[in-house]
């Protein structure tokens, strides 16, 4: 039967007690990790958010407390009053391992059924079970460590931005749907039947309005929502650290955020980030790494060998070059002895990225093996080896096709090889980079129009503005992403604040004046009243915590996440609502066949 506290007050957390507290009387409260009955003594490991403390009950200490302690089971919630003493058998593996509490009084605050999951670190349990019983999963010490990291990170960010003159301001959760990119989550309006709010994909438009309003420096740590197909490490609702600044250029935003990154990683994870952070253009990132978020912790860079093979009589290479494509390669060190079956699997791998196949050259000490040797000849093979500065033991992997296919497939193959060779196993390095000079626009062949790579309010680079209408694909953006170990940590841009330039941008994107005003009229109207030059950046806060806490699963850093199907096993959301609620909203549900 559950007991009440009856005025009993906790004096200290379990994990805080040390030798300096010996001789003091304390009250601790928490959950029973385990219990051992050794005849005349009962030992209870008591756990709270700060750690585990051993409590000993004995007939000679207090018989009533001893008998009650013998009734407890794992995950019972209890309160214990007693005196802290030195342990006879210390456990140096525990922070509290030199002391124990002599239990003189115990209250069983609530009982527990046998938990469906073990409350321990490094739990190897099916994810569906963990999510269904998330409140138990969150009791585990390793999970609690993660959320302490999350809390500390948010505090460091808030303190830093406050010290740098930022105001924390909130923007609406119920806003206007402006579909461009991912699908919106829609919220029906009862007051306006047939009309809908949208949950924000980002606070983009409102933070720009705050700059028009003269708030100069804004930030918030806020929820954002995207109704998109969930890939690994994506969630339908996620947290963003969002900021916007007035009267700045790209260098100002980057300089401030480098200091923020340095402070966060030092204070939270004791990682020294050297400034300035390396910069790499979008073109260089794609040409060398086949990715706009390159992992710089290892080499194996992509090399263009088109010139080296342009004269060889090999149809695959010739066709690619004649059609405006290229022939490129990566070299995998110490892989020349890789078996044919393994290489064939790599060939199948690149085909998933639309490559037609994978050519290869194994540069061994006593021979050079390659299925294309008969086409390239000794001279052609040597040209490839020289152009790559290949060494004995290297395996050269080659793709020929249009540039987009070559770069994407070799970029993915580079990461796959690092994984197979365990190049990054136990690698604790943090390699940051700014990626800059992104294309402002990309051409959507299906819709036969240009679309914004970031959003329609991104400022073109000054020297490229003249090409916006005549050659839109050539225009680069004043956009910048901060990349860490092959993942995008955040991204931002300088915004357009010139209404005439914004109109040109909408025109290039295929918006009529009417459709632009229908979607973004409130922002365009505001821009009639002296908007300042402004720009900003947003971090994926959940992804940042993954790095700081050392976990590879985004669900580990969100208290109550959805599963891969955007479903919550704990609350069983989304769920059916009753007809009355739907009727009030003027909504009818069409059942899918």
Curated annotation (Swiss-Prot):
Positions of region (Aspartate): 204-207
Biological role stated in the UniProt entry: Catalyzes the attachment of L-aspartate to tRNA(Asp) in a two-step reaction: L-aspartate is first activated by ATP to form Asp-AMP and then transferred to the acceptor end of tRNA(Asp).
Record-given protein name: Aspartate--tRNA ligase
Reaction(s) catalysed (UniProt annotation): tRNA(Asp) + L-aspartate + ATP = L-aspartyl-tRNA(Asp) + AMP + diphosphate
Coiled-coil region list: none
Gene name of the encoded protein: aspS
PROSITE patterns reported in the protein's UniProt record: AA_TRNA_LIGASE_II
Cellular component, GO, one term: cytoplasm
Binding site for L-aspartate: 180, 226, 454, 495
Any one Gene Ontology BP term: aspartyl-tRNA aminoacylation
UniProt cross-references to Gene3D superfamilies, sorted A to Z: Bira Bifunctional Protein, Domain 2, GAD-like domain, Nucleic acid-binding proteins
Family that this chain belongs to: Belongs to the class-II aminoacyl-tRNA synthetase family. Type 1 subfamily.
Residues that coordinate or bind ATP: 226-228, 235, 488, 540-543
Transmembrane segments: none
Pfam families: GAD, tRNA-synt_2, tRNA_anti-codon
GO MF, any single term: ATP binding
Highest rank taxon of the organism: Bacteria
Organism per entry: Clostridium novyi (strain NT)
